[in-house]
Amino acid sequence: MRYILQIFTGGWDKPNYTAEEILCRLKQLIPKMPVDKVILGWYPDETLYRSVGEYLHENGVDMLLWMPVFAELGDYVPMKPACDLWGKVLGSAAEQEGENFAFCCPTDRGNLQAVTDVYEKAFAKAEFDGIFLDRVRTQSFVGGAEGVLSCGCEKCRQAYRLHGVDLDEVAQACDLDKDRFFAADSDLLKHFLDAKQKIIAESILTLCRSFKARGLQVGLDVFAPLMSSFVGQSLPLLARDADFLKPMLYRCTFAPAGIGYEYEQLRRCAPGAGYPDIVTDEAFLKSELDALRGLPCRMYPGIEVNRRDDIAPTDADYVRRSLAAFAESGVEGATLSWDVMLAPDAHMPFSF
């Protein structure tokens, strides 16, 4: 199995590492395992990326820019924020490692233009081989029901109407009986989520085409299949326009994007909706991997290899067994997430 390495170089205003530190780590890892790509971002420092890219290209490894889309980018350039169905602007639902989870409107043309403008201004000269688009979604249940029920601006309302959904009806149903609205057999919820997934996919298609026209590969960061529809991610639709997807199969992360964590936020928001307890064990992981079969692009699911006692208490056995399940499923590879700079060598494939 082949690997993608992920490194969080820092937010918009503060670097986490120097080029020398990153190169030192990559020179430890790349000779010991088959690496296809390295994803780096999003601190804006073209000199750093050119320096790292020179080493990667000498070793036949592609370098991709890690670029946030509907969250984070608004900290760097002005963007139109998302609002809920009741007209309230959504704030940041959670924050970690300098990351901001305040989301922006997914249909606003100016927001989409900002993504390509920032690439051209801050990164185009760094000789990236591709771009890895993150936050290609709405807010999750971490922001409460209101986060999932977004965006409710007039432009988004028009987009939903084109897909046969009246957002006023959705808001009224949620106000009347939130548990009933969020139940798995709710027809209105299904129609809302189907429309939201199409709306998000239409916007991401615009970005994919724009970056592919620049000769760049495009990868997308996506939620695990269990929770992806709630944040507007149809994996079949997104896979049509991407070169690869990285479903975040994070079973040991107690923070946004962690599968169990996100699922429990759903149950907290709608405790009477009938969602059962789940165990995110290896049988569950196999079912999530099975859900990726047949999608029309390459799959490099993500496994959290870094360890943080507070939010990601991973260990070598968890990583080893997860990667074995990935390999057995037949996916193209795995993304070692979300920052190999923080991962113990014991969590790396060459240690197993």
What label would you give each PLM region?
Residues M1-R25, N306:
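Boundary/entry segment of secreted carbohydrate-active catalytic domains
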Residues Y3-I7, V38-L40, M63-M67, D129-D134, ...:
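Hydrophobic faces of well-ordered beta-strands that scaffold small-molecule active sites
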Residues F8-W12, Y43, P68-E72, R135-T138, ...:
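Active-site beta-loop-alpha junctions enriched in small/polar residues
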Residues P15-L48, K125-G130, R240, F244, ...:
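Catalytic domains of carbohydrate-active enzymes, especially glycoside hydrolases
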Residues C24-L29, V35-D84, L188-G215:
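Aromatic-lined substrate-binding rim segments of carbohydrate-active enzymes
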Residues G53-E54, D62-A126, L205, V340:
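Active-site-adjacent "subsite" loops/lids of carbohydrate-active enzymes
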Residues Q96-E282:
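Polysaccharide-binding and catalytic clefts of secreted carbohydrate-active enzymes
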Residues A242, K246-G260, I278-A291, L295-F352:
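Substrate-binding cleft of secreted/luminal carbohydrate-active enzymes
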